[in-house]
Amino acid sequence: MTLRFYDTASATIKDFVPVHPGEARLYYCGATVQGAPHIGHVRSALVFDVLARWLRFRGLEVTTVRNVTDIDDKILVNSRASYEQDYSGDHAREPWWALAYRFEGVFGQAYAALGIDRPTYEPRATGHVPEMHALIQELIDAGHAYPATDGSGDVYFDVRSWPRYGELTRQRVEDMQDAPDADPRGKRDPRDFALWKGRKEDEPLSASWDSPWGRGRPGWHLECSAMAGKYLGAHFDIHGGGLDLRFPHHENELAQSTAAGREFANFWLHNGLVTYEGEKMSKSIGNTVSPQDMLREARPLAVRYYLGQAHYRSVLDYRPTSLQEATAAVERVEAVLVAARAAGLGLDRDTQDVPAEFVAVMDDDLNVPRALAVLHETVRAANSALATGDHDAARPLVAAVAGMSDVLGLLQLMDLEGAGAGGAEHRALDVLVQDLLAQRAAARTARDWASADRIRDQLAAAGVVVKDGAQGSAWSVES
């Protein structure tokens, strides 16, 4: 069966034909590192992690790009807020770039804990300002962008100059809301959006760059177009992100890229949002859930299973029992592999043996719910064969379970050495250590260095060594 995906732009499921034969090039929007992640951020990253894994399984050479937006209005606002809330006098104001780097690490720790692969490239917006300047100049030269005439230093995309504007979300310009990213003064049309934002007097000098239009910083939409073009070329296969990014972010990306003469993405894939008991997650309501919250309640294996179990285009609803149910389901898969090892059946963690039905449903718009149904069906058959001692029948079934678990990113998080008390003891210890690491991460986020050091020392006294890295903290037992 041919790979097929739902393309938001055409609102149809289309056959996937790579731009470059034998390759798949994928760009998906990463974090704006203004604060700690919630489960919606992690779900999106996991969706595109599974997509990349499946494309590789199908024999394609996959290049992935997940950007980091490390300069943004909200980052500057939160940096100012962190200063205003610091009454101790012990610390100077946290610079915007330090806040961004700190939360980039928190995101990385969440990704790593859930086995989400590092992308081929993970570019920061601040490292690609020259490419953004070049794209702006192309648009000005083509008559699709203009510097504001009010002396602000802003540069805007002229939506009226591009007849295709609105094609991604199938809207007419007349029906769109005004762009919220800048004052309407200096614009030709209220819906024109900022490509470059002139520096304001109350903003740090370090948060701006010299440009032909004056000192300032790039607009959010421009950042992604410039970085996608640099790493994937003018024409690539898939652009992805959360459903909430379709408009205005992805609409504006598409417009400025195609207006500059780039074909841009063949497919636009959008994952559904996450709700809490049917309601939108909101800080004001107080119903947001963080990856750390989930990892305190369940193993990374169960959290990954939960976040990936719904179809990527569906809403994923979180309930207090969600992780308990996910734990029960995925540990049935893990248990059959542990039982197979105990019975003397070898297990290759890199096996690629999967049933034809699994391949068919994954090829059909990445239908993970149906793929999980095939997985659990195979688990039941393998358990029956093991129970009767029919190892010849069990062997291919166990290999299929391992292969499907590997493709879905579950196998790497399983404790297949745990046939007996040792594995259970390790899991129990991991729960305790992860809780302490979460407390330590919270202390570091609050810049409470004394508490963070005290937790590290407590762990060290118990023989647990903590290593901090760019992707978060890892632990091991001192030998």
Curated annotation (Swiss-Prot):
CDD domains: CysRS_core. ATP binds at residue 283. One of its GO terms (biological process) is cysteinyl-tRNA aminoacylation. Binds 1 zinc ion per subunit. Its cofactor is Zn(2+). A motif ('KMSKS' region) lies at residues 280-284. The keyword Protein biosynthesis applies. Its EC number is 6.1.1.16. It catalyses: tRNA(Cys) + L-cysteine + ATP = L-cysteinyl-tRNA(Cys) + AMP + diphosphate. It comes from the Bacteria. Its main location: cytoplasm. Transmembrane segments: none annotated. SMART domains: DALR_2. Zn(2+) binds at residues 29, 224, 249, 253. Residues 171-197 are annotated as: Disordered. It is found in: Cytoplasm. Pfam families: CysS_C, DALR_2, tRNA-synt_1e. Residues 182-197 have a biased composition (Basic and acidic residues). GO terms for cellular component: cytosol. GO terms for molecular function: ATP binding; cysteine-tRNA ligase activity; zinc ion binding. InterPro entries: Cys-tRNA-ligase, Cys-tRNA-synt_Ia_DALR, Cys-tRNA/MSH_ligase, CysS_C, Rossmann-like_a/b/a_fold, tRNA-synt_1_cat_dom, tRNAsynth_Ia_anticodon-bd. The keyword Nucleotidyltransferase does not apply. Belongs to the class-I aminoacyl-tRNA synthetase family. Monomer. This is Cysteine--tRNA ligase. It comes from Kocuria rhizophila (strain ATCC 9341 / DSM 348 / NBRC 103217 / DC2201).
